[in-house]
Amino acid sequence: MKVAISFIGTNKYLDYLPQYYENIEKYFLPNSEKTILAFTDGELEDTPDNLKVYHQEHLSWPYITLKRFEIINKAREEIKKNDWFVFIDADALPVATITEEEFLDRCCGADTNQVPLFGVHHPCHYLKMPPHLQGTGAYETNEKSEAYFDVSTLPPVYWQGCFWGGKVPSALAMIDELQARVDRDLEKDIVALWHDETQINKYFYEREFDVHTFGPEYAYPEVFDQYC
């Protein structure tokens, strides 16, 4: 199995790359052929053969996160060489082995052709922490936004933007669509409430049967260890 993994690390976030690379190689899909796609404004020398570097200027907040779909698309041709695309935040680390069997497992007898996308249940939503499960939750309520969500009934899952992806054709379709939605919002001077994460949640909710949801134990901060 060939897997492309996206690392966006501009400015000081590039400092996370050495540990990120080491942990990905050691713990994440250990029997797969992995390529790390590093988007950065920093200088990298003597990089491993499976680390591909793409120049990316640092953008002010929140655009460095909001425009991540556009950033990732710079590596489109490299992504196409793989079976799976995975996004993992620069400051997120696998700390225990995630096997191929675990990663590819799907509920209720389904397979990855039927459920080609994946996300992770936000641990703060799981723990019912504010603003989740209160009022309008963490959803965009501006009807003019591409990420607008009818909050009359809040969904049972809110996905965190730190860990998501899918089989390459489905993942690229998602990246293209969300890049277009972000651009249309920006043309109207709209930034969704939680930026790229808000856009991801709208997209996943529209396709909930195409999305496998990993539990919050795949995304929690160390301080949540006793809860997840």
Each PLM stretch: what is its role?
Residues 93-143:
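Conserved donor-nucleotide/metal-binding helix-loop-beta segment in metal-dependent transferases, i.e.
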Residues 15, 19, 71, 79, ...:
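Catalytic phosphate/metal-binding cores of nucleic-acid and nucleotide-processing enzymes, i.e., regions
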Residues 37-38, 86-89, 94, 165, ...:
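A structural signal for short, well-ordered beta-strand segments and their strand-loop junctions
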Residues 1-67, 74-81:
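N-terminal anchoring/stem segment of glycosyltransferases
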Residues 10-12, 42-45, 58-59, 92-94, ...:
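Short, solvent-exposed loop/turn segments at secondary-structure junctions
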Residues 145-228:
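Catalytic core and acceptor-binding pocket of nucleotide-sugar-dependent glycosyltransferases
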Residues 15, 45-47, 94-97, 102-103, ...:
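Short catalytic/ligand-binding loop motif for oxyanion handling, primarily in non-cytosolic enzymes
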